[in-house]
Design a protein with these regions (language model features):
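A short, basic N-terminal segment
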Residues: 1-57, 81-84
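Walker A/P-loop nucleotide-binding motif
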Residues: 57-77
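The feature captures the helix immediately C-terminal to the Walker
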Residues: 76, 80, 259-263
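Mid-core helix/loop region of P-loop NTP-binding domains shared across ATPases and GTPases
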Residues: 94-106, 116-178, 182-195, 199-206, ...
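Alpha-helical sensor/transducer elements of the RecA-like P-loop NTPase core
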Residues: 209-228
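Conserved alpha/beta core segments of nucleic-acid transaction machinery
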Residues: 272-314
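Terminal-proximal interaction/regulatory segments of ATP-powered molecular machines
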Residues: 329-395
Length: 395
């Protein structure tokens, strides 16, 4: 934590001191500028990217590792750092709308979240939006137009581009083969990095020449992450060292789940008017995170109408979730919802197919037909509730 952050903490301390000072600082979907415990991985990525410092492109690459290993945090921090450092040194890309100003050209770096750029159109739009100074239209143009615009942006001065496409291989998202196909028309000017979870040996596609593994965190690294985040986002001494160790041991190398448990514990403590996180707060925070857990980043990247359905779902008592029909009826009656019962039911089935919720088959049928399916969220509901409400301007 830097000096300014320390001073702000002192300013906020006092009679009305809050337990949670900054929800973003402890959020499992927020990334920090300097990822904790990932120095060796950053060095591997810098070794891979070494050709860019002489103006060349590296080979295409696959960065992989299990959930919660900090892949997104590392790649976003690295790309932000490269853009910042290279811009200060005067090495910038030239485009059709940006004046040439550098004698030594290096590739531009673009990060794309596959959760938000699932189609060809969305991917090209995300890249062009970062690459060009001019506004890229979202409507009234087709995918072919954007593909042509990307070729034109890269062609005039033999410009080069390194694109990282994150969260590849998730349900409804792009695959590695999709990324390769989408950049094939400009493969002489683009090096792509695909970031995903699937081990290379389990992929049934031709793999890029470079593969970089991001292993699960060790317990001591998770403790450091939790301590750092708590230092930035919570009141002083709100989280004890033994509590950090308990979360880290439970999370088994998964920083997403560890931070979700911390967030849930802090939120529970706030609701109970505790000045520090108590053992019952910690227990509630841990119990709120299913194992395995759907990433909250996936949930919060869903379209707003589906998020509203989930927000209504997490408020339902268990008796209203005993079947898809009963859950649908209860959701439709929520003041948050202005959708028809048919639309809500379709959303519930789609969310179940995507692994966001689960339809749990009941054992008893009473001898009549198929047993009903209880609807259970597959994500940390307390954390989602708070993050969703904060996004909507609610407290």
């Amino acid at each position: 934590m830097d000096l300014k952050a320390r001073i702000r903490r002192r300013q906020r301390g006092g009679v009305d001191a809050r337990l949670v000072l900054d929800y973003d600082a402890i959020s499992p979907v927020a990334h920090v500028e300097e990822p904790v415990g990932r120095g060796p991985v950053l060095e591997l990525l810098l070794d891979y990217l070494d050709p860019v410092f002489t103006g060349d492109l590296p080979p295409d690459a696959y960065v992989w590792g299990p959930a919660g290993t900090g892949k997104s945090a590392v790649v976003t921090a690295l790309f932000d750092g490269l853009r910042s450092q290279l811009a200060r040194s005067g090495s910038v890309i030239h485009t059709s709308t940006r004046a040439a100003s550098a004698t030594e050209e290096v590739p531009e770096f673009v990060y794309v979240d596959g959760r938000e750029a699932r189609s060809d159109f969305a991917l090209y739009h995300a890249v062009l939006d970062r690459l060009l100074d001019e506004r890229v239209p979202e409507k009234g143009v087709g995918t072919d137009t954007l593909r042509k615009k990307l070729r034109e942006a890269l062609r005039p001065l033999s410009e080069k581009l390194v694109v990282a496409v994150d969260h590849v291989g998730e349900p409804d998202g792009p695959t590695l083969a999709d990324v390769r196909e989408r950049f094939e028309p400009v493969d002489d000017s683009v090096a792509w990095i695909v970031v995903g979870r699937t081990p290379p040996g389990d992929l049934k596609v031709d793999l890029p020449p470079e593969r970089i593994e991001v292993p699960a965190y060790r317990d001591h690294a998770l403790v450091d992450i939790l301590t750092s985040r708590a230092s930035d986002g919570l009141a002083q001494r709100a989280l004890g060292h033994e509590q950090s160790r308990e979360i880290a041991t439970w999370a088994e190398g998964n920083a997403h789940d560890a931070l979700a448990a911390l967030f849930g514990a802090a939120d529970h403590a706030t609701a109970e008017n505790h000045q520090r996180i108590q053992n019952d707060d910690l227990t509630n925070g841990i119990m709120d995170v299913p194992r395995p857990s759907a990433s909250l980043g996936r949930v919060l990247a869903l379209p707003p109408n589906r998020q509203r359905v989930l927000r209504a779902l997490v408020e339902l008592p268990e008796r209203d979730r005993q079947s898809v029909d009963s859950a649908t009826d209860a959701i439709v009656n929520s003041p948050r919802i202005d959708l028809s019962a048919g639309t809500v039911k379709r959303f519930v089935y789609e969310l179940a197919e995507a692994g966001i919720v689960e339809r749990v088959r009941e054992d008893s049928t009473n001898g009549h037909g198929r047993p009903p399916s209880r609807v259970e969220p597959c994500f940390a509901t307390r954390v989602f509730r708070r993050l969703h409400d904060l996004q909507q301007g609610e407290r």
